[in-house]
């Protein structure tokens, strides 16, 4: 047996549970070469490239993981749990205080990050008019990469694009159009021609979607400060106060 094959055969295996999947997911730690690739991409700062690398690592480390069947937030959570088992429970981030030129290191305990869940149960079927009904689904990591959409700190245009991606079907009378049958541009035009009240129905589903959200406190110069991390992007750089 070759040395590399021997190493791989001795890798530990872990299990984890998320809401979208009934069975436990099995995974191995990521390897040095995989971490190196992620670090190199992270230094360049392009979030789409970072997420594409995260996707590749997740698919390599997890057994039978279908990223199109779980929410973006769940994929982000799985990556944090993977990092926890691969490197350690503590993650050091930098916080830059107002009026200070030097950032402070702060420690995040990854084992305390909770699995993302929808804030409240909502109907995914929404009536836009008496004749038009749509069904929505939560955005996935695959969606974000495929459509190259800015999911972190989105502009108004980004949010409309995200909403268009979330449209699963459009029912007009007895005719049903699936989201894949309609281009993103057509769905964006569809949303932009809604009234504010119609748009609000879709926004409610979006704003209550599962999200990776972690609140914690850290003492800096004898003062306890409260922080909040939202989305995987916050776990890659500077953090701010809540």
Where are these regions (language model features)?
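Long C-terminal interaction/binding lobes of large macromolecular proteins
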Residues: 1-242
């Amino acid at each position: 047996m070759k040395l590399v094959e021997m190493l791989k055969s001795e890798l530990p295996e872990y299990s984890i549970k998320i809401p979208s999947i009934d069975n436990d997911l099995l995974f191995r730690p990521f390897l040095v070469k995989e971490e190196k690739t992620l670090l190199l991409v992270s230094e360049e700062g392009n979030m789409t490239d970072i997420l594409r690398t995260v996707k590749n690592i997740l698919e390599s480390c997890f057994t039978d993981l279908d990223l199109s069947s779980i929410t973006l937030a769940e994929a982000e959570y799985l990556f944090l749990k993977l990092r926890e088992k691969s490197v350690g429970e503590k993650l050091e981030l930098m916080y830059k205080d107002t009026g200070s030129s030097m950032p402070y290191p702060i420690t995040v305990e990854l084992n305390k990050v909770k699995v993302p869940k929808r804030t409240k149960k909502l109907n995914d079927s929404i009536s836009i008019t008496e004749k038009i009904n749509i069904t929505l689904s939560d955005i996935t990591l695959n969606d974000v990469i495929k459509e190259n959409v800015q999911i972190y700190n989105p502009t108004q245009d980004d949010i409309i694009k995200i909403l268009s991606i979330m449209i699963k079907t459009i029912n007009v009378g007895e005719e049903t159009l699936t989201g894949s049958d309609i281009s993103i541009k057509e769905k964006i035009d569809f949303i932009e021609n809604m009234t504010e009240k119609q748009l609000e129905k879709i926004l409610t589903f979006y704003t209550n979607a599962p999200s990776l959200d972690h609140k914690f406190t850290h003492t800096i110069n004898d003062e306890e400060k409260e922080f909040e991390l939202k989305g995987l992007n916050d776990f890659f750089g500077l953090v701010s106060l809540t």
